[in-house]
Each structure stands twice: as C-alpha cells, then as structure tokens.
Amino acid sequence: MSKYKKLFKNAKFWDQKLAVIFVVPLSKTGITPNQITFITLILAIFAGYLFALGDQNSLNYGAAIFVIARFMDNFDGMIARIKNMETKFGYFFDYTTGGISFAVMYLGIGYGLQDSTLSFWAIVLGIAGAISSLACLNIIFR
C-alpha cells in the first residue's frame, strides 16, 4: 500500500482525508513540515489581528483565515511521515504553535468585541480563553 493510501486510510476525520489531497503534491516539493507549521502560525496571528479590528468584514476574514490555518495544521504531520522527517522538535513545535494560535484567536476576538454588548467582559473572556489554551500546552508536555 502506498504511503498516500495509508495516510488516507488512517485519517480519522473528514478534514484529514481532505488534507491528503493537498499533502500529496506538497510532499513532492522542498517544503519542510516545520515550514508549514510556521506558515500556520503566521496565518493564525494574522487572523487574530483581523479579529482584533472588530468590524464585521475583518471578523469574517479572520474566521476564514483561522479555519484555513487550522486545516493546514494537518499538513505538517502528514508530510513529516511521508518524508520520514518526524522529530521531537517538530512535534513540540506543532503543538506549541497550535496552542499559541488559539490563544491569539481568543485575545483578538476579546479585544475586537470590547465595543459590543459584552464590553469589558469580552476582554476578560478573551484572556481566559488564551490562558486556557496555553494551560493545555502545559498539560500536554508534562
């Protein structure tokens, strides 16, 4: 069984199966799993910035970019397995950027919604969400 068919068969969720379609051509390029992880982090930070702007268009674009970033998070591990590039650093980097991505999203949404009916509580909830995302990293790496 080819590596690609095995990836597709082992994919548990629909987004992982869909990701295989993108991973196959990407795996034939020089891009590394850690580069993909870094790209997803940059996209998530940009999405957080858009969330922080708070207007409807920015919130919508921020949401779309964040979904794309999280979808692309499937790519790095798959490419690492295909290219036999799995490392402890890559595993740590992937999980850390995932936690940071969610923290930035919560902070951005909280800041962006401070002028809504939530007012001050939007920021409090954003900070609470960010702290919980980062706390999960602490639990994972114990």
Model-derived features: where do they sit?
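A feature for the membrane-embedded catalytic helix bundles of lipid/isoprenoid biosynthetic enzymes
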Residues: 1-23, 95-142
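Juxtamembrane membrane-interface segments at transmembrane alpha-helix termini
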Residues: 52-54, 73-81, 134-142
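Residue-level recognition of pore/gate-forming positions within transmembrane alpha-helices
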Residues: 41-44, 70, 130
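Hydrophobic alpha-helical transmembrane segments
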Residues: 38, 60-64, 123-127
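Topogenic membrane-insertion module of multi-pass membrane proteins
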Residues: 1-61
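Acidic (Asp/Glu-rich) catalytic motifs at the cytosolic membrane interface
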Residues: 57-110
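Juxtamembrane/transmembrane-helix boundary motifs in multi-pass membrane proteins
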Residues: 28, 53-57, 86, 90, ...
